[in-house]
């Protein structure tokens, strides 16, 4: 019996560099100045209202137009300390750029994301006086568990206020989703770690890696040692398909596939000749597109509901299709097709809506595959933080500032109930929690970021 066609090195060596290069190359200075001049600099700007972090978009764009890169970066990073990453991965087409007045008038919004990236990257490339200087030490110690976007934002905000922060993470690197969970072409050039280096440069943040809550540390232990705890745990579990899933080469979780690509040279990552990705979100798109970029000949995304139910944005769907990915809706996984321990494909049941409920039509079909990637969502594992913390919808219940049911414990990011699983929203959670923790400790101050714009 022929083995599954699952292997690495499907492309010529030179192809990998181009395939996994920056998906959206940055603007040069001339392009940025021209694009900045398109902004109306609206008063009460709808783009700013649409941004979860309240980024003063007209202000930073006006500073770009004035060739004041430091001032533009100051405006961005004061609202969003992960402004460089968000410039790369935010779904701007459904947030700030959708709200742009130019979008209404001309169907072509100002390229806010690219301008934000231009300003932040430009500032990082220019050594000079730091935008943020740590406040006078308070003597208070805060544990931040999880070094993804929410945890990083919380740690930075707390350190800026003079608190000593220990930043715990289960992985070998800081960054969480930014380091392990995004397509390589979205964050090319090692930007995730460059941004983290900048965040840590404020001082007062001590990373502790390879340290997992529930295994190496406990919430009770942290509360005994620290004045407050922020949980930015993300979603550690992966949803199962709900069918028998034998252990087979090529049958794996999409998040693990994406993480492997982020931490390895692409030429050593194995991919099937024919790939099926089950799911309809951005993780599914990232896995499907990267499978094509690795040399897969046929990649099919399969989603159980109709096109309107896909959680991947229209932009992401079009991105997948332009890279040769087939998106097939109205089908649910029924069985793994295997023979002699070799993956051969997936059997699906065709579906439809009947009185608002998803039902099978009675039709079945098989999509041949050497590789099947599960991308049907992730779950919060409650056992890590313990049963004492209240949940809502399977995630941690909090108030608007991130305070949980436990005294001295805050939470934010994907582990927090009611969110949209957006990086920019996680940053806002961490930012607001830092303010709330500072206030709860009785140390809220009237300090403000230095807003004096100078040329970088």
Give the role of each language-model region.
Residues 137-150, 271-281:
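Beta1/beta-strand and adjacent pyrophosphate-binding region of the FAD-binding site
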Residues 164-167, 171-201, 207-208, 288-335, ...:
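Rossmann-like dinucleotide-binding cores of NAD(P)H-dependent redox enzymes
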Residues 247-273, 356-420:
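FAD-site-proximal beta/loop scaffold in flavoenzymes
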């Amino acid at each position: 019996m022929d083995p599954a066609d699952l292997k690495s090195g499907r492309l010529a060596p030179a192809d990998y560099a181009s395939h996994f290069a920056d998906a959206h190359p940055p603007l040069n200075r001339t392009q940025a100045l021209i694009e900045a001049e398109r902004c109306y600099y609206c008063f009460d700007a709808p783009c700013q209202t649409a941004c979860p972090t309240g980024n003063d978009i007209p202000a930073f764009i006006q500073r770009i137009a004035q060739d004041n890169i430091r001032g533009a970066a100051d405006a961005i990073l004061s609202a969003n300390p992960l402004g460089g990453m968000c410039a790369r991965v935010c779904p701007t087409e459904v947030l700030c750029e959708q709200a742009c007045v130019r979008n209404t008038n001309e169907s072509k919004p100002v390229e806010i994301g690219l301008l934000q990236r231009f300003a932040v990257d430009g500032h990082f490339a220019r050594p000079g006086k730091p935008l943020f200087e740590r406040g006078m030490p308070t003597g208070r110690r805060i544990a931040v568990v999880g070094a993804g976007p929410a945890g990083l934002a919380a740690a930075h905000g707390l350190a800026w206020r003079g608190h000593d922060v220990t930043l715990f993470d289960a992985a070998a690197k800081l960054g969480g989703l930014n380091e392990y969970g995004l397509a390589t072409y979205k964050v090319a050039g090692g930007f995730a770690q460059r941004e983290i280096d900048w965040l840590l440069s404020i001082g007062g943040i001590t990373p502790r890696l390879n340290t997992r809550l529930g295994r190496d540390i406990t919430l009770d232990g942290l509360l005994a040692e620290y004045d407050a705890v922020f949980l930015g745990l993300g979603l550690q579990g992966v949803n199962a398909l709900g069918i028998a899933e034998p252990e087979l080469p090529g049958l794996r979780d999409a998040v693990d596939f994406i993480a492997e690509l982020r931490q390895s040279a692409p030429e050593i990552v194995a991919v099937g000749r024919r790939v099926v990705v089950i799911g309809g979100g951005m993780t599914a798109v990232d896995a499907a597109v990267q499978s094509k970029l690795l040399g897969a000949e046929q990649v099919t995304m399969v989603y159980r509901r109709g096109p309107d139910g896909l959680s991947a944005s229209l932009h992401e769907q079009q991105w997948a299709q332009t890279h040769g990915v087939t998106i097939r809706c109205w089908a649910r996984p029924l069985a793994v097709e295997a023979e002699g321990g070799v993956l051969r494909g997936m059997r699906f049941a065709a579906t439809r809506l009947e009185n608002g409920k998803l039902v099978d039509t009675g039709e079945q079909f098989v999509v041949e595959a050497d590789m099947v990637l599960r991308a049907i969502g992730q779950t919060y594992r409650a056992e890590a933080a313990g049963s004492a913390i209240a949940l809502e919808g399977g995630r941690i219940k909090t108030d608007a500032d991130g305070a949980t049911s436990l005294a001295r414990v805050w939470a934010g990011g994907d582990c927090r109930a009611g969110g949209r699983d957006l990086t920019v929203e996680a940053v806002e959670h961490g930012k607001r929690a830092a303010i709330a923790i500072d206030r709860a400790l009785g140390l809220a101050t009237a300090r403000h970021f230095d807003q004096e714009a100078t040329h970088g």
